[in-house]
Each structure stands twice: as C-alpha cells, then as structure tokens.
Amino acid sequence: DKDFSAIKKFKSAGVKVIFLSGDTNINESIAKNRSIDFYASRGVCKSAFINIFKSTYNILPDEMCYVGDDIFDLNIMKEVGYSFCPSNAVKTIREYCCGNILNRVGGDNCLDKLFDVCESRNIIPPFDEELFYNLDKDDKF
C-alpha cells in the first residue's frame, strides 16, 4: 500500500509519524503492527494532545503537520503549522484547509499524496533512500 510506503518515506526523512484517532479499534492495531505511536482521542479534544506531542517529541506546534477530515479535527488544525485534508473531508474542514486539500479521498493513498506535497513545498527534507529500503526490510513494515 502506498500509504505505508509514504510512512517509511516520512520516517527516512526524519519525520516522526503519529496516529491520533477516535477510531481506536482499527487504527490502534494498524499503528502497533507498523511501529507507529498511537494516541486515542475519543472523548478528548484533539488539541489537548499538542502539549503531549511538544514534550514527548521535542517539536513545536508550528512544525507539526496534521491530516483530518471531520469537524472534530478543526481545533487541532488551528494549532499546528500545516493542516491538510482529503478531498472528501466535511465542508468546514475543506474550507479551513483551502490550499491544502489533497486530491485523494480518505483511505485512498492520502499519506502518499501528503508526502509528495510536503516534499515539493520543502516542508520536509528529501527522504534517505538507503534508510527507506532498510525500513522496508523491517518485520514491522
């Protein structure tokens, strides 16, 4: 799947990938199997995780990138430096993201498109091909 290749590209570019989701059953299992940190947000405002991410990952909010598709994502999108959404996000999110709407529907290689956009805009450095291929050999990927 192109999204898992994109996660490896992000990681090999030095970018920490984190799942933050209210859908814990499926996403937590996927994250665990792929060695991706997972935070469950059901019942908690997602922006409350900003301070956790700052201290845990030593990153400032304006350096963070977030992809979301529902109204529950708006509060955290307003606090991070880069907010993106899939093309089938709810209207409020599409309006907020305006120039950052990925031309993919959710679940259709959005992370692959996100990587391409972030790399082309110099938001992230180019990925390290050798590290990428080494990650591909890892049992968890």
What role is predicted for each listed range?
Residues 1-13, 21:
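A positional/architectural concept
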Residues 11-16, 24-141:
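C-terminal cap/substrate-recognition subdomain and adjoining C-terminal extension
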